[in-house]
Amino acid sequence: MKLLGISQFLLIVSLHVYGQDPTTIRKTQYNLDKGIAIEGYDPVAYFKQQKAIKGKKGLAVYDEGATYYFSSQENKEVFKKNPSIYEPQYGGWCAYAMGLGGEKVSVDPETFKIVNNKLYLFYNRFFNNTLKSWNKDERNLNTKADQNWNKFLNSQTKP
């Protein structure tokens, strides 16, 4: 019995030291408002309708720490088959800010771009549309944003 207790303790410690589950990472690193992703916009609509469409609370899916709203039952079912395809890059934070300086900056969900079947969201307030700046140096900013986002994710998996 004592051996079982020690084994369970070691398992818990190793999970804490060597990695976090996806739910914990999302809850601590993703751009969520009370657990809601993309301010309630439908992630599938960006791809299928090529526009930002507000989702409905009644068409929600909880996925590893984040709740997504959908504008239609069809979009909800599509998402459930493979959520990672439709989730925004960098946890839903501004792609430009992530690339420029590794900062988590809120977004305007209606300012977005899809590149290589990946959804990028951008800050667009106070006459500052960061999508325009992103487009001027997209390749470089994308590379840096990937590196910076990985630092956030890796900080969750190290003691």
Could you tell me what each predicted segment is?
Residues Q20-P159:
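Charged, low-complexity intrinsically disordered segments
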